[in-house]
């Protein structure tokens, strides 16, 4: 009996440790200042080498996080563990100014297995979005030619999702699945102008859900065709916000909570189709994200 009690404890410990590992900034794009940040295109793994597509892929040995219905080909005799990391390099140029950055860190883990002959499950944690930018502006002071005011905008942090996937093989060719979980994290944004600094810190959390369907067509020969469809509704993000103001020249300081405009996770609709043979895998995805309910994080 002790053996069966240790498994959930080990999983809980693994989740806690993995969340602390992946809770690192993973972008340097200025557009990450809007909404909930720059969305993670994928959890990585084998699909990263295919352009982060795979909604229609359901293959043995693959833990598909793009479509919750596409995990019904996992090995039925053992647990499957998946741990990964990501790295990125970016170079920016504007007139005669150049800058570059390199980022890399562990970013995901997942554990999957078959529960019953037609029921498969997976638990994991991975980045959902990331905020990371540094923008400097220069404006001439009105009425004072040759005098300029410099402003510095900075942002860091991100959101991370913990999820539980359940997939059911309704028939030999048709599978359905659902992802349920939470998204949480902290985003810090600041604006510096001369000696004044305003910092916004927002702790965010939201319920997360997406749904998937996967179907394998009845074909003859070596070619196997399949299609997948996923949908994630737009859900509200809850905030706990804090504003800090400081001015080194006047020794003024303010630290208080504040209310920002309501933010939402974007609605996501995705579809994919794939063709596989013994040597080739050809697949294509279409993804639609609706950001219309969001504004800049500053508001």
Stretch-by-stretch model annotation:
Residues 1-2, 61, 259-260:
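Residue-level detector of alpha-helical transmembrane segments in integral membrane proteins
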Residues 14-16, 43, 74-76, 222:
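A generic structural signal for short, non-catalytic loop/turn and secondary-structure boundary residues
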Residues 1-28:
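Bacterial Sec-dependent N-terminal signal peptides
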Residues 24-49, 94, 110, 114-299:
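Outer-membrane beta-barrel porins/channels
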Residues 6, 14-16, 55-63:
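Short coil-to-helix leader/linker segments, especially the first N-terminal amphipathic alpha-helix
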Residues 36, 47, 52, 61-62, ...:
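Generic secondary-structure boundary/loop-capping signal
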Residues 57-136, 158:
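Outer-membrane beta-barrel translocator/receptor signature
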Residues 41, 52-57, 73, 239:
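Generic structural "secondary-structure junction" signal
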């Amino acid at each position: 009996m002790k053996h069966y009690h240790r498994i959930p404890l080990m999983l809980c410990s693994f989740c806690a440790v993995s969340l602390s590992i992946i809770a690192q900034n993973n972008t340097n794009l200025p557009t990450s200042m809007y909404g909930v940040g720059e969305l993670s295109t994928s959890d990585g793994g084998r699909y990263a080498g295919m352009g982060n597509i795979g909604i229609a892929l359901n293959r043995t040995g693959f833990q598909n996080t793009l479509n919750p219905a596409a995990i019904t080909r996992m090995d039925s005799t053992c647990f499957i563990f998946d741990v990964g990391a990501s790295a990125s390099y970016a170079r920016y140029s504007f007139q005669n100014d150049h800058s570059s950055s390199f980022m890399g860190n562990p970013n995901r883990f997942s554990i999957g297995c078959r529960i019953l002959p037609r029921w498969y499950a997976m638990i994991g944690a991975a980045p959902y979005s990331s905020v990371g930018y540094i923008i400097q502006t220069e404006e001439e002071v009105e009425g004072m030619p040759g005098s300029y005011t410099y402003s510095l905008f900075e942002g860091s942090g991100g959101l991370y999702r913990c999820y539980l996937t359940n997939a059911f093989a309704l028939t030999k060719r048709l599978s359905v699945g659902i992802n349920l979980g939470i998204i949480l994290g902290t985003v810090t944004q600041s604006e510096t102008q001369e000696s004044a600094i305003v910092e916004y810190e927002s702790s965010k959390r939201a319920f997360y859900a997406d749904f998937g369907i996967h179907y394998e067509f009845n074909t003859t020969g070596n070619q196997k065709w399949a299609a997948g469809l996923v949908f994630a509704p737009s859900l509200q993000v809850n905030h706990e916000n804090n504003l800090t103001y400081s001015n080194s020249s006047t020794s003024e300081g303010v630290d208080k909570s504040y209310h920002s405009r309501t933010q939402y996770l974007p609605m996501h609709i995705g579809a994919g189709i794939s063709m596989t043979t013994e040597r080739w895998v050809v697949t294509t995805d279409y993804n639609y994200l609706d950001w219309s309910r969001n504004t800049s994080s500053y508001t």
